[in-house]
Curated annotation (Swiss-Prot):
Primary site of residence: membrane
Transmembrane listed as a keyword: yes
Alphabetical UniProt keywords: Cell membrane, Glycoprotein, Membrane, Transmembrane, Transmembrane helix, Transport
Pfam families recorded: Sugar_tr
Extracellular compartment segments: 45-71, 121, 179-191, 303-320, 373-468, 527-535
Domain of life (superkingdom): Eukaryota
Chain positions covered by the region annotation Disordered: 1-20
Glycan-modified residues: 58, 317, 374, 384, 448, 452
Annotated family: Belongs to the major facilitator superfamily. Sugar transporter (TC 2.A.1.1) family.
Name of this chain's protein: Proton myo-inositol cotransporter hmit-1.3
């Protein structure tokens, strides 16, 4: 287990930390808000694709759209975001944090317009690729920019604002999706859903034309006067805090130059990270945090909220979207929990408690879908599949093997023809014209359904069950638990873990891990639901989160109360800390130094 005693104030630079927190003005909040619009765009895209994909498969020029194409269109964005996050690290070191954020807002605007105008599935895919690049840029650089441009006493709160805006984006996406679902949704409404994303992207672009670069980046690139001016605005004119931050940044930069001299010829920053044990350790821990966050299934729940609600037994698309508004609103409200507590109870405790809640509600989600499966109507015996039934129709043999409605409708090629009299049904294949309103053969074939409409009902994605509301209620508590800590804290911790010279590259790697596993989880959800059942899928996510809980308990340190540069020492061995202390003492040329007192008792 990690045990860390407090680092002496000012342990990084030798400058005594001011005894009282500064009063912050409007500027720092305006700066942080403008940056975390990137989080809003992240959340909006995650939420709007869930609503839009209820209608995109019916759009002229795009249909037919099978589950593989749907998974590609949904999942290409997180896949490309992984590439974008990796590229934005070196890019932000060279061009600056501000320019990368501006580039992200421009790319997002173009991507939203292309998605809205798409007349084929390929064009829609291109738009989704551009959105992925923009989100990758923003998800990596926004937490870094906010952490480097925030007063240390509210840094955790402001970085948590990134996650808050993700949840705001989710809420707005579902509201916009609900509103536009009444405007010819199959041809026009889904286009308006995608187009709306250009509005906040343009707002962010305009804001950043007037906002400064990160003071740490400015100092590192020799623009020390500008760095001091920006810090003066951030700290609202409190010169003792400005001097303290300048000393911290100066010491960190001197250490970077020393490290570069020691590792001359080692090549790119990533090679230096891998050859520096304590930074390598921090990057591995940070990357695993991001990986485990995605393996909890969160973005599966976000991307496929509509599918999950329909699977629970809600048939109407409008109702599905408005229920999504409620669930995303709970997610938004839950984000205020870490904002209120992150600087009081610390990152580590909040993360552990949140993960325990996620585990419990993943178990409950799995149980709820198991109950739905057991309660769904059974299929007739095979010998009863006689009336107008053609066993040679494509997928007929596969549909025939399913024993109940839930198993049947989970397969994308099958629907359930329910007998209102017998309280059983037939599992029948969809027709080749991609219609979901009737079966390709059997009693619910178009002509038969018309003649026998009062006796039979065709269900394409859901089953009648008395447990309909249960998964929806559990999903609300799952999202509340997740947003209370597991959502923001991997981002907060990764923004704090690394020294200045490694920060952009290490955060790029950890963010890429988030997006890669986002891609893996979202790309496999529909297929996994068919192979392992819906309830089995959530039990798998639960198992992954249990492993994550053990990992966090033993390997993730508390960073509350430390400056960004002090956090680096939490990952050092005792011998490395002694050497670091010696360098600190020598750098002050005999001046009295506060000693560094801490222990990092763990094996990694």
């Amino acid at each position: 287990m990690v045990q860390v005693a407090p680092v002496a104030a000012g342990a990084g630079s030798g400058q005594t930390r001011p005894s009282s927190d500064p009063k912050t003005g409007w500027f720092v909040y305006m700066l942080a808000f403008s940056a975390v619009i990137g989080g809003f765009l992240f959340g909006y895209d995650t939420g709007i694709v869930s609503a839009a994909m209820l209608y995109v498969p019916n759009a002229s020029g795009i249909k037919p759209l099978d589950s593989v194409w749907q998974e590609i269109i949904v999942s290409i964005t997180p896949g490309v975001a992984a590439i974008g996050s990796l590229c934005s690290g070196p890019g932000s070191d060279f061009l600056g944090r501000k320019k990368i954020i501006i580039g992200a807002s421009v790319t997002f605007t173009i991507g939203a317009i292309i998605c809205a105008a798409a007349w084929t599935k390929i064009i829609l895919l291109i738009g989704r690729i551009l959105l992925g690049l923009a989100i990758g840029f923003a998800s990596m650089i926004v937490p870094i920019y906010v952490s480097e441009a925030s007063p240390s006493h509210i840094r955790g709160k402001l970085v948590t604002g990134f996650q808050l805006m993700i949840t705001v984006g989710l809420v707005i996406a579902n509201i916009i999706g609900g509103a536009f679902s009444y405007v010819d949704p199959d041809q026009v409404g889904w286009r308006l859903m995608f187009a709306f994303a250009a509005v906040p992207a343009i707002i962010q672009f305009v804001c950043f034309l007037f906002l400064p670069e990160s003071p740490r980046w400015l100092y590192e690139h020799g623009r020390t006067v500008e760095a001091r001016e920006v810090l003066t605005r951030i700290y609202n004119g409190h010169t003792e805090w400005v001097d303290y931050e300048i000393n911290e940044i100066s010491f960190s930069y001197e250490e970077e130059l020393r490290a570069k001299a020691e590792h001359a010829g080692n090549g790119p920053t990533i090679i230096r990270i891998l050859k520096t044990p304590h930074v390598r350790k921090a990057m591995i821990i940070g990357s695993l945090l991001q990986m485990f966050q995605q393996l909890s299934g969160i973005n599966t729940v976000m991307y496929y909220t509509g599918n999950i609600i329909r699977s629970a037994g809600v048939k109407d698309n409008h109702t599905t979207i408005w229920i999504s508004v409620g669930t995303s609103a709970i997610n938004f409200l839950g984000t205020f929990i870490p904002i209120a507590l992150v600087e009081r109870v610390g990152r580590r405790v909040l993360l552990l408690v949140s993960m325990i809640g996620v585990i419990l509600f993943l178990i409950a989600m799995g149980v709820s879908f198991l109950l739905i499966n057991n309660d769904s109507l059974r299929t007739f015996d095979q010998q009863n599949y006689t009336l107008n039934y053609n066993p040679s129709v494509k997928h007929a043999a596969k549909c025939l093997k399913y024993s109940n409605c839930d198993f049947c409708v989970t397969d994308e090629n099958c629907g359930f023809c329910e007998s209102k009299v017998a309280k059983k049904g037939y599992c029948l294949p969809f027709p080749s014209d991609d219609s979901s309103d009737y079966s390709a053969t059997g009693i619910c074939e178009f002509s038969n359904l018309t003649n026998n409409g009062t006796d039979f009902e065709w269900e394409d994605t859901y089953c009648h069950t008395k447990f309909t509301v249960l998964p929806i209620i559990i999903m609300v508590f799952y999202l509340l638990s997740f947003s209370a800590g597991y959502a923001p804290l991997p981002w907060v911790l990764n923004a704090e873990f690394y020294p200045l010279w490694a920060r952009s590259t290490a955060v790029s790697v950890s963010t890429a891990c988030n997006w890669i596993f986002n891609l893996i989880v979202s790309l496999t959800f529909l297929s996994l639901s068919q192979a392992a059942t819906k309830y089995g899928t959530f039990f798998i996510y639960c198992g992954c989160t249990m492993v994550a809980l053990v990992f966090v308990f033993f390997f993730v340190p508390e960073t509350k109360g430390y400056s960004i540069d002090e956090v680096e020492m939490l990952f050092m061995t005792k011998e490395e800390r002694r050497k670091a202390q010696k360098v600190l003492d020598e750098s002050k040329e005999g001046k009295h130094r506060n000693s560094v007192a801490m222990s990092f008792d763990t094996k990694f």
